[in-house]
């Protein structure tokens, strides 16, 4: 029988959907339709500092998971992290990511969203390589947390509602902590250890986000990679912004600047000066120092229980996040 002129010669089904080429970085790409992953591949070509991968390796010093499982978990986290950045940049109307134009300015919004969504399912597909029967439930749980946190942050921005510090911390535990926790929970599921490392992971996630908020408004490195004070242009209620607004509840200047979503350099410089005048950057640095000290205490307790020397890699990550140790310009951006 002659092939139908309106039907393709290839079969698209479960087997066809899993045939993938492997990129030079070891991550799956779609063989037949590279356009599907083009926005994702574009973002990967300008890699970040990959702190999540470093954390996975560091925690595995305690958990001793086989290397093939670690590689799979790191692949899952990389796919999800980059997918979330593609979506974040659209939602925030960002202009730069890692020093280059954002993906949707090259490939368009629709194609970028589709590529990000595809990455979620490519990551989900990798779960089959893990031994833990609860891996899918863990994956779903933390992706729900991630979207819950992201949703609250978007709600505050769109409604011009300044959250409390407690609300902010809860959001960070969900949004930033989600992928941190996912990596370690998947590792724990492949390990013989029954010790819970999630409390330390939660501390690190909060430390990372508050430090990121601070750097966005204070770091020359961040300005180069993401634009000057991008959080102000986004109208984002970051940690120093929340403290500054609540330090002077009767003064609406900063709240109104956020409302404008201004790209004006002078306006953003004024906002930074205002935030500094309320002592909010100093307060932020104090919080970062406090979280770093608490993380070091948690790590010391783990080493005491599990054996000295196992925390060396984690301690190196902490030095990177500790602004006193690394210097405030150190770049750990996404």
UniProtKB/Swiss-Prot annotation:
Dimethylallyl diphosphate binds at residues 97, 175-176, 209, 216, 226, 236. One of its GO terms (biological process) is alcohol biosynthetic process. CDD domains: Trans_IPPS_HT (cd00685). GO terms for molecular function: (2E,6E)-farnesyl diphosphate synthase activity; dimethylallyltranstransferase activity; geranylgeranyl diphosphate synthase activity; metal ion binding. Isopentenyl diphosphate binds at residues 49, 52, 81, 98. Mg(2+) 3 binds at residue 212. InterPro entries: Isoprenoid_synthase_dom_sf (IPR008949), Polyprenyl_synt (IPR000092), Polyprenyl_synt_CS (IPR033749). The record marks 120 as: Important for determining product chain length. It catalyses: isopentenyl diphosphate + dimethylallyl diphosphate = (2E)-geranyl diphosphate + diphosphate; isopentenyl diphosphate + (2E)-geranyl diphosphate = (2E,6E)-farnesyl diphosphate + diphosphate; isopentenyl diphosphate + (2E,6E)-farnesyl diphosphate = (2E,6E,10E)-geranylgeranyl diphosphate + diphosphate. Disruption phenotype: Simultaneous disruption of idtB, idtC, idtF and idtG eliminates the biosynthesis of the whole spectrum of indole-diterpenes reported to be produced by C.paspali, including paspaline, paxilline, paspalinine, paspalitrem A and paspalitrem B. Its EC number is 2.5.1.-, 2.5.1.1, 2.5.1.29, 2.5.1.10. Pfam families: polyprenyl_synt. Binds 3 Mg(2+) ions per subunit. Geranylgeranyl pyrophosphate synthase; part of the gene cluster that mediates the biosynthesis of paspalitrems, indole-diterpene (IDT) mycotoxins that are potent tremorgens in mammals. The geranylgeranyl diphosphate (GGPP) synthase idtG is proposed to catalyze the first step in IDT biosynthesis via catalysis of a series of iterative condensations of isopentenyl diphosphate (IPP) with dimethylallyl diphosphate (DMAPP), geranyl diphosphate (GPP), and farnesyl diphosphate (FPP), to form GGPP. Belongs to the FPP/GGPP synthase family. This is Geranylgeranyl pyrophosphate synthase idtG. It comes from Claviceps paspali (Rye ergot fungus).
């Amino acid at each position: 029988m002659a092939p139908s002129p309106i039907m393709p010669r290839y079969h698209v089904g479960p087997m066809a959907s899993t045939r993938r080429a492997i990129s030079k970085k070891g991550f799956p790409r779609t063989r037949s339709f590279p356009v599907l992953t083009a926005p994702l591949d574009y973002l990967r070509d300008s890699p970040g500092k990959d702190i999540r991968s470093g954390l996975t390796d560091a925690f595995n010093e305690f958990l001793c998971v086989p290397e093939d499982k670690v590689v799979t978990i790191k692949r899952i986290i990389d796919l999800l992290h980059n997918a979330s950045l593609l979506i974040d940049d659209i939602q925030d109307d960002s202009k730069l990511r890692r020093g280059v134009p954002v993906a949707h300015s090259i490939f368009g919004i629709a194609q970028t969203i589709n590529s990000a969504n595809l990455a979620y399912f490519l990551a989900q597909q990798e779960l089959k390589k893990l031994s833990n029967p609860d891996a899918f439930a863990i994956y779903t749980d933390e992706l729900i947390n991630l979207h819950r946190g992201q949703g609250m942050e978007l709600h505050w921005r769109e409604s011009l509602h300044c959250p409390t510090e407690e609300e902010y911390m809860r959001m960070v535990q969900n949004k930033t902590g989600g992928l941190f926790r996912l990596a370690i929970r998947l590792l724990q599921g492949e390990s013989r250890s029954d010790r819970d490392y999630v409390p330390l992971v939660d501390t690190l996630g909060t430390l990372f986000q508050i430090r990121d908020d601070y750097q966005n408004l204070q770091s020359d490195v961040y300005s180069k990679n993401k634009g000057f004070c991008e959080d102000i242009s986004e109208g984002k209620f970051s940690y120093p912004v929340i403290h500054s607004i609540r330090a002077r509840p009767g003064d609406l200047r900063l709240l109104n600047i956020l409302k404008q979503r201004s790209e004006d350099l002078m306006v953003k410089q004024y906002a930074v000066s205002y935030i500094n005048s309320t002592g909010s950057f100093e307060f932020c640095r104090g919080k970062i120092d406090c979280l770093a000290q608490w993380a070091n205490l948690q790590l010391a307790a783990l080493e005491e229980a599990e054996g000295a020397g196992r925390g060396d890699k984690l301690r190196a990550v902490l030095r990177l996040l500790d602004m006193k140790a690394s210097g405030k310009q150190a770049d750990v951006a996404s």
